[in-house]
Amino acid sequence: MRTEDVDVAVIGGGPAGMAAAASARTAGAERVVLIERGDRLGGILNQCIHDGFGTKVFGEALTGPEYAQLYARRVRETDVSCLLDTAVLDVSSNRELTVCSEKGMRRIRAGAVVLCMGCRERPRGAIRIPGTRPAGVFTAGVVQDYMNLRNIMVGRRIVVLGSGDIGLIMARRLTLEGAKVLCVAEILPYTSGLARNVVQCLDDFGIPLHLSTTVVKIHGTERVTGVTLARIGPKGGGVRGGSTYLACDTLMLSVGLIPENELSKRAGVGLSPVTGGP
């Protein structure tokens, strides 16, 4: 297996990874490699077509793809070696990486390793919603990918569970595309997204927000036909009061993120029992 020595290896080509790689090169590291398993740099930015990115770095409001393109250009201008379509299979405690691409496997020995793998969305199984398992249950990021990158409309009558920022933004996006967002249900007594997104994405479009409320059952066989909502008592203390059935064809989940920490574990990095991250 071919072996390569570098000063800094950055795993993950999203915004954090690009910033880390460019900063390492600017700070004097001569051999910096940026490893990304996808076919382009930018990570989640590539599907975030709303603006508001780049105000601090570039001094103007950019869409996610614009921000990713400009930062990728900055990375390449600093002479960082970018390995796309390349997966990191293992990271040892002595900073030795095993990577794989269509060109085969190789080993990279690094003076320093920067972990920028990001996170993934919590799926339905992680929150244990009872009911059947029909089509029509999506995480907000998947809905964003389908609509913004693939031009696929996921449904017409949508209930959103969770008030994370991506969920709020996609509730607005779905409404703009002609769907009916029946409500956003949040199990906590407050929203988890930014206040400005609540105003701009829900209030401005007349989308109801139900706090201390969650989905307690999903209905449908082949496709979602509806969900049952129920109020939750203080501190999540069980269902309080009656339940409400809403007929819908889609349930969109925006219920938090899980760190991509498998490589961190392999490298022997200590992880928080609360967040699952370093």
Annotate each PLM feature:
Residues 1-278:
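Residues forming the flavin
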